[in-house]
Amino acid sequence: MILLILSGGKSRRMGCDKLLLTRPDGIRQIDWLAGLAKATGCEVMLSRRDDSSPPVDLPVIADLHPGGGPLAALAAAHAARPDQPVLMLGGDLFLLDAATLKHLLDHRDPARRATAFANRIDGRPEPHCAIYEVSGSSLAAGWLARGDFHARHFLESLEPRVLDLPQPAALDGANTPHELAECFAKLERGVRLKTLIVRYSRSLHEVLGQEEEQIETLACTVAGLYEELRFRNRLDIRTDDLQANRDGRPLAWDEILVRDEVIDFTLKGGV
């Protein structure tokens, strides 16, 4: 089996290559992932958009469809090793651990076209930590040829075996500096379920259909809490357009949450 680490270079929203970021323990993300990957015994390779020099000493598979995202990486891996299943890992999985990878490998179903974990919020299969059997990876090129680059839709079309995560936050990713701060807070403080009251301003109430709710969250920061709410409710509202408050006091997005507290979200310039 190939274990393919996705590496795409500079992230537009993060502003840098996430694999080169230094974790709270002082280790680069790419070195952490490479260590986890090698411990599985799989043939570890690095996906790149081109044949540029990799940030770590791993063999490279260059995308055959530049700009095609993870599906392009999967298609390239299949072309390079057409007889091998592919375990694909996203580069921004800062909370991934050895136990999660072992669980995926131990519960793989070769009779299905893929095996994946369910997203902890919406239950849909996660494409960036999944095993694609040859019968599944061989179909990626066809999707790319049609101009369909949606990795999650592709994975769902394979009707994968879907597993529950043994560590609920293990696949929480980071696409922005706020989300990175949330991941690092989880690494430093641990992942613990907490209950909060969330209240919404009139404008948000009209969108969500409720003024207040009690929620259980794994978030450590205000940004992490909003990301869970945004994902669950499919909100198209950026943090730049919101203000979070505690007892009438404005909160920074990386401020740490406290159990049983009340957080108010208000649209900037709104009510």
Language model regions located:
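Glycine-rich phosphate/pyrophosphate-binding loop and the adjoining helix
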Residues: 168-191
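Nucleotide and nucleotide-moiety/phosphate-recognizing core
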Residues: 1-135, 141-148, 156-170, 178, ...
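Short, charged, surface-exposed loops that flank catalytic or proteolytic processing sites
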Residues: 146-150, 221-224
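Ubiquitin-like/PB1-type beta-grasp interaction modules and other compact soluble beta-rich domains
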Residues: 188-271
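Residues that scaffold the ATP/ADP-binding catalytic core of kinase and kinase-like folds
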Residues: 23, 139-140, 183, 207
